[in-house]
Amino acid sequence: MGSMFFKRARMAAGALALLAAALPAAAFIGNFRGPKVDGDLAVPGLSAKVRVLRDEHGIPYIFAQNTPDLIRAQGFVTAQDRLFQIEGYRAIATGRLAEAVGEAGLASDRQIRLLGLRRNAERHARLLSPEARDFLLWYAEGMNAYITAHADDHPVELKLAGFVPRPWTLEDMVTVLHFVNWSQAANFKAELGMQKLIDKFGADKALRDLLPMNVNPDRKLQPVIVGSAGPAVPLAAQDIELLAGLDEAAAPMAPLAVGSNNWAIGKSRSASGAAVLVNDPHLDARMLPGIWHPVGLFTPDIQAVGAALPVVPGIQVGRTAFVAFGVTNAYGDSQDLFIEKIAPGQPDHYVDGNQVRPFQIIEEVIRIKDKDAPGGFREETLRVRATVRGPIITGPTSGYDGDTLLSLRMASAELPGGGIGIDQLLTARSIADVDKAAQAMDVIYFNYVFVDKAGGIGHRSTGRVPVRASRQGSHPKPVGSSDDWQGFIPPAQMPGTMAPARDWVGTANNDTRPDGYAFDYSSYFASSYRIRRIAEVLEQGKGMRTKDQLALMMDAQNLQAPRLKPAMVAALQADAANADFARILEAWDGRDDKDLAAPLIYHALYERLVYETYVDEMGDKLARNWLGNWYAWQERFDELAKTPDSPWFDDVRTPQKETLPDLVRRSAAIVRAELQARHGADASKWTWGDEHRIYFFSPLRRSGSGRDWLGFAEQPMSGSGATLLRALSPFMGGFNVEFFASMRLVADMGDDDKVEAVVSGGVVDRQFHPHQKDQLPAWTEGRLLNWWFAPQQVEAHAVKRQELVPR
């Protein structure tokens, strides 16, 4: 989870001394010990007793006699372990953060209320099927049992952050699902970026030279560039920087938008003779205890072990007795920006084709904690205007009051179906059943990869993606006389494959559309380097064991580097001042190893080279903004490097004509000066790990004194944004790692004792709790832990035993 809702906690805590001073000693010690997890505990709402066993890592394994009690108990146990986290999720997702933390949460609340996530969720909740409604309500009932009946057991962090827990409703649950949907969406940001480029260069040049290049190694026709024929309108008078707040609104769960790897191998490639599922979701999970909550779920009909997102029932990654499944972000384009016009002389109306319509006006009242206000709160009314497409995201409230506006249309706002899909995963018995469940997921945009006990493997992308008459969603489009959205891609025609002949399947946020795909699914995907490495290894894989799958997750081989390294070496060999760079890079095998000098030189040089290529024409602000979105430009730039005399490499600020080698040498001089200042003159003694580092922090102390004590000490890390060992840093923002494998999991359907997995943190979100970060040593060392699957193994390894008793 991101930083927004923890700002208040960090400000309030300041230092550990505040935590100790603000609370009675008994409360402080209770927080260290954590929730009561042994003995009997009364739980309102249960129909029968439920047993909860915990292993040495604190992972709960829940044994219930029926499904309703199982999911209620999961909600209860999740609240025991993660109440601080789930209350933060709700405050952000519902636009009620300022009510808890005051002014620090107001900007987030304004943006969330403008988007209307709660309004959309309330409509969605009314449409849910009885099965979906029950599944969500059972979980809410369990959380509420802990919130209302065990207030003396709540974590002290709630008080520090200003949260006052209250019972969860069905609408709260659905709102969180819609927030997950929003936080996964990346096309909105990409559309804004492309509009800025259109404003700068004009539509022809921007769409011809700068649209993302989408590569699927399995396609014969390469590459695909979509949207180039679509209409584009310059908005030069419009300062769309004013929209930056909408991007920031997704920050609290923006980690969900980044990436992941998943793959599966069939029987012919595994040592066990059974199918194997592998998943390592890439998120910003530096804030402890991480995002995923490991859990085991057992009834007479259900046997499941894996990881769940707190507030989402069931498991999102893991296995059952019959199937296993894992997820990556699919980047299905579910949002569009539309260029709207205010009706001449009618400021409260807009032009819709040949009609003039009144804006829908929605008033959102935001409650803000304020010690100087009567009763401790003040109120602000936000006036939201909306067209038939969606809310206006520009206008007087953002400081712009022209006659051209942008509206945001979201598929999640357009009455999804009654199912949620996630409730079907626990009872799926085959890959066909998982595929059916995936097709029912309207508001979650994942690439599911899955396997079954019979050896079947498959993949399906989820969510609702509009069928666009314009066949483009890459940049804002003017409102026309007819609706651009002509329904949605049929779920069975979303990208996917079942039982491929090669007996493996994988995704890495890449373009998975085959040749001739009929729909404009998206214009925004990860570069192809990770999926190419997966294919390179799995195509040769025979008799693969769990250790082989782990080795592939930890693989630091960079397949992007060979595209640029030869040009870099050639340019540097002609430059005596940088001959050592040339020697180091030429000898490099392409591994982004933390102990090598070459990766540091390569990545620093690559980033500077890309920046120098575009800054002369874009300017610093636009260049950094666009290049900060790696997926938007990387394949495009790497292809551009094949043409070293491209006009883009010419610096228009100088009288001479520069080429790629000239910019390589210029960039090398800048990089050398920066790195020498930090690490000394001898480049051969530098290492990637000198700068490419990762740290984990407590919500109470993100930086400064005590950060490593409350969190987990900073350390060097191998990998990069282009490797399967994902370790992505912000563009030109230093090399500290922000996005990485938040969990690593291998589910071998031939091993009925266990799933082997690890999370980048722990189970419990309480400061100083022994299970807040106890899986990090294994994670940093590249080891997997046993998450027990067989009930007898759970019994044998239980160190805590609790019975939840109906009340």
Predicted features and spans:
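Terminal end segments
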Residues: 520-579, 662-807
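Glycine- and hydrophobic-rich flexible loops that cap the catalytic core of alpha/beta enzyme folds
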Residues: 257, 297-314, 318-323, 327-484
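Proteins synthesized as precursors that undergo proteolytic processing into mature forms
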Residues: 118-119, 140-141, 412, 420-446, ...
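Hydrophobic alpha-helical segments
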Residues: 335, 397, 404, 443-541, ...
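N-terminal Sec-pathway targeting helices
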Residues: 2-18
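Substrate-recognition/specificity elements adjacent to catalytic centers across diverse enzyme folds
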Residues: 24-276, 281-284, 288, 295, ...
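Gly/Pro-rich active-site capping loops and adjacent beta-alpha segments
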Residues: 69-107, 111, 326-377, 381-383, ...
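Charged, long alpha-helical assembly modules
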Residues: 605-689
